[in-house]
Amino acid sequence: MDDAARFHHVSVRLVHAIATVESGQHANVVHLNTDGSTDIGLMQINSRWLTTLSRFGISRSDLHDRCTNAYVGAWILSQNLHRLGLNWDAVGAYNAGTRGKRMAYARRVYRTLNMTPPLSSMPAAPRTTQQPGLIAKLLRPLTWEGNQ
């Protein structure tokens, strides 16, 4: 997660907080939403992103890889921050479309950030990428296509 956050120029602590809120930092979590979409993995990448991600060779099964999922999640967050500015609305947009839901989500992330110890006291996460080539696909600049 740390490398993904740094690569996409977003806060490492913020990415950790979002992963905690989304999945409890568990890579194998899959959640079926009431609208029929699915949230996948560590950063709970919504299945609506699959069309965009497929253009870069990233499939649904690739999102089960912790490292790939972290890079995609950090990229989504960076796009929100670029589009909406460095504010809590952009953080909330990671999870929700409407302003009220965005703010409720952002408050959860904020509370999690306040409970998270400084990164220097956190143990390093294990590197578990099974397919390092997938990360190379994410290292190319991705363009925002208004997805989500």
Task: Name each model feature, range by range.
Residues 1-127:
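Catalytic glycan-binding domains that act on GlcNAc-containing polysaccharides
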Residues 123-148:
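Intrinsically disordered, low-complexity charged/polar segments
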